[in-house]
């Protein structure tokens, strides 16, 4: 049976004190609702309906930009009249012969495995709820059960404000996440009433309707409470962030990575690691990052959308973005590799070296205090301290080519476009603006002049 997912995302989130819709606040640099959409897709949903209200234009623009595919449909809830009313806005799109899963845009940490257990729990002619047992269920709707045919069956959900003293003692709480047949769901939604303490159309009232028709209401449960917690303010959002990062850290360690302090790593995308990978404190990984075997990451590094080869050492305080680093390289400390950088095998970039759109050849080295932009550098090249590729003339950027085995002396400026030949040498302090042929020595600095007996000026008292 096909599956559609309805994601409720209409809440304003007043307690966030923000102009953004609540569901667009981020966990790991992704909107909360983005995590929910990812889960729906991993479940194989044919259609995903996002029910929006406040801030609809920015929500649609954000999700359209970040989510490709034709499985996403936006449905407006003009008036916020309760969860039942919100789901009902998607009813015209739902078919009778599909299953419909209801999720929440501000509950981003529900595991796909938990949702799969909910799908498996649903009877053919019934529905399924995700419930959780809480030590303090204050504010949650309570699951009401009765003994039927020797089993404690779900017969309804009572909201906190409508519960009596006995019902408030129930510690099995409703998460709001449920699964039902499309035809059944539409029928139950059409019969909802707002005759309750909130004056709203409760989605939870469909449970009693299902029981009244003799349908079995099955339940499934998350492994941990945090899976079904939402964020109504920034404190709760921070709690979700740390829980998410703790989950990722645990997965990395189980996969074989060593984390110096699991509480001090942030993964804001997808990080894959090989064996014997070591990550020191306060490192941030963004986008798609791959670390091969035996990679060592020092403290305070930021790595974004990059591939790091085997046996590479990234020393502390280095920033790497959209870069490919091949095996056996070393980087930093305090290096910056900007988009388009490539370090070939066994090359080295040292402290305070910046690269952009540059390839550093096999075995080549740039040890200190250099800027290498729009450069193609051959094998076994030595880049002296303070070398600058002058790649920008105020309008266009040009390329510097440095051949194999070249030696660039310290404090040199290479004015692009320029070619330095194989085994060529550039003397320290030179400004090179013309081609240097293979095996040539290029010098442009002024001849040294010594003045004997020179007296420095004396300050007047």
From Swiss-Prot:
List the residue ranges of the region (N-acetyltransferase).
Answer: 256-461
Main location group: cytoplasm
Q: Select a single GO molecular function from the record's annotations and give it.
A: glucosamine-1-phosphate N-acetyltransferase activity
What does the note accompanying the cofactor annotation read? Answer: Binds 1 Mg(2+) ion per subunit.
Q: Specify whether Magnesium is a keyword of the entry.
A: yes
Q: What's a Pfam family in this record? A: NTP_transf_3
Q: Which residues bind Mg(2+)?
A: 106, 232
Q: Does the keyword Cell wall biogenesis/degradation apply?
A: yes
State the EC number(s). Answer: 2.7.7.23, 2.3.1.157
Residues the record lists as binding UDP-N-acetyl-alpha-D-glucosamine: 8-11, 22, 77, 82-83, 104-106, 141, 159, 174, 232, 338, 356, 371, 382
Report the cofactors.
Mg(2+)
One GO BP: cell wall organization
Q: Which SUPFAM superfamilies match?
A: Nucleotide-diphospho-sugar transferases, Trimeric LpxA-like enzymes
Q: Where is the active site?
A: 368
Pathway(s): Nucleotide-sugar biosynthesis; UDP-N-acetyl-alpha-D-glucosamine biosynthesis; N-acetyl-alpha-D-glucosamine 1-phosphate from alpha-D-glucosamine 6-phosphate (route II): step 2/2; Nucleotide-sugar biosynthesis; UDP-N-acetyl-alpha-D-glucosamine biosynthesis; UDP-N-acetyl-alpha-D-glucosamine from N-acetyl-alpha-D-glucosamine 1-phosphate: step 1/1; Bacterial outer membrane biogenesis; LPS lipid A biosynthesis
Indicate where this protein resides in the cell: Cytoplasm
- Give residues annotated as binding acetyl-CoA: 385, 391-392, 410, 428, 445
One GO CC annotation: cytoplasm
Question: What InterPro entries does UniProt report for this protein, alphabetically?
Answer: Bifunctional_GlmU, GlmU-like, GlmU_C_LbH, Hexapep, Hexapep_transf_CS, MobA-like_NTP_Trfase, Nucleotide-diphossugar_trans, Trimer_LpxA-like_sf
Region of interest (Pyrophosphorylase), ranges: 1-234
What reaction gets catalysed by this protein?
alpha-D-glucosamine 1-phosphate + acetyl-CoA = N-acetyl-alpha-D-glucosamine 1-phosphate + CoA + H(+); N-acetyl-alpha-D-glucosamine 1-phosphate + UTP + H(+) = UDP-N-acetyl-alpha-D-glucosamine + diphosphate
Q: Where in this protein does the record put region Linker?
A: 235-255
What role is this protein assigned?
Answer: Catalyzes the last two sequential reactions in the de novo biosynthetic pathway for UDP-N-acetylglucosamine (UDP-GlcNAc). The C-terminal domain catalyzes the transfer of acetyl group from acetyl coenzyme A to glucosamine-1-phosphate (GlcN-1-P) to produce N-acetylglucosamine-1-phosphate (GlcNAc-1-P), which is converted into UDP-GlcNAc by the transfer of uridine 5-monophosphate (from uridine 5-triphosphate), a reaction catalyzed by the N-terminal domain.
The record's comment on protein family reads: In the N-terminal section; belongs to the N-acetylglucosamine-1-phosphate uridyltransferase family. In the C-terminal section; belongs to the transferase hexapeptide repeat family.
Q: Subunit structure of this entry?
A: Homotrimer.
The protein's name: Bifunctional protein GlmU
Supply the source organism for this entry.
Answer: Colwellia psychrerythraea (strain 34H / ATCC BAA-681)
Task: Please spell out the taxonomic lineage of the organism that makes this protein.
Answer: Bacteria, Pseudomonadati, Pseudomonadota, Gammaproteobacteria, Alteromonadales
């Amino acid at each position: 049976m096909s599956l559609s997912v309805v994601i409720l995302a209409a809440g304003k989130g007043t307690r966030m004190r923000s102009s953004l819709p609540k569901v667009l606040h981020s966990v790991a640099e992704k909107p909360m609702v983005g995590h929910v959409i990812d889960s729906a897709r991993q479940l194989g949903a044919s259609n995903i309906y996002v029910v929006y209200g406040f801030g609809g234009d920015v929500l649609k623009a954000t999700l359209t930009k970040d989510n490709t595919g034709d499985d996403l449909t936006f449905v407006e809830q003009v008036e916020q009249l309760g969860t039942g009313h919100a789901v009902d806005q998607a009813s015209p799109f739902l078919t009778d012969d599909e299953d419909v899963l209801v999720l929440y845009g501000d509950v981003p940490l529900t595991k796909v495995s938990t949702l799969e257990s909910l799908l498996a729990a649903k009877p053919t002619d019934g529905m399924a709820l995700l419930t959780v047992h809480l030590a303090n269920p204050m504010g949650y709707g309570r699951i009401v059960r009765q003994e039927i045919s020797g089993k404690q069956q779900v017969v309804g959900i009572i909201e906190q404000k409508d519960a009596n003293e006995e019902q408030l003692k129930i510690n099995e709480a409703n998460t709001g996440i449920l699964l039902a047949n499309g035809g059944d769901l539409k029928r139950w939604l059409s019969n909802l009433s707002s005759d309750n303490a909130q004056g709203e159309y409760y989605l939870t009232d469909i449970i009693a309707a299902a029981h009244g028709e003799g349908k079995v209401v099955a339940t499934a449960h998350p492994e941990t409470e945090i899976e079904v917690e939402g964020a109504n303010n920034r404190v709760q959002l921070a709690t979700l962030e740390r829980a998410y990062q703790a989950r990722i850290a645990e997965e990395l360690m189980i996969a074989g990575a060593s984390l110096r302090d699991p509480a001090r790593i942030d993964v804001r995308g997808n990080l894959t690691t090989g064996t014997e990978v070591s990550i020191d404190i306060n490192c941030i990984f963004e986008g798609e990052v791959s670390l091969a075997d035996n990679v060592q990451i020092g403290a305070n590094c930021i790595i974004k959308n990059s591939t790091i080869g085997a046996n590479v050492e990234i020393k502390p305080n280095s920033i790497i973005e959209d870069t490919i680093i091949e095996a056996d390289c070393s980087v930093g400390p305090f290096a910056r590799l900007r988009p388009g950088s490539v370090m070939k095998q066994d090359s080295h970039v040292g402290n305070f070296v910046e690269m952009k759109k540059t390839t550093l050849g096999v075995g080549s080295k740039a040890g200190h205090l250099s800027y290498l932009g729009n450069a193609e550098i051959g094998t076994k090249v030595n880049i002296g301290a303070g070398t600058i590729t002058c790649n920008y003339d105020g309008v266009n950027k040009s390329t510097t080519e440095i051949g194999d085995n070249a030696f660039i002396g310290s404090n040199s400026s290479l004015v692009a476009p320029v070619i330095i030949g194989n085994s060529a040498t550039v003397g320290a302090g030179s400004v090179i603006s013309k081609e240097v042929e293979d095996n040539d020595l290029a010098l442009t600095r002024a001849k040294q002049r010594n003045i004997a007996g020179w007296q420095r000026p004396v300050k007047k008292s």
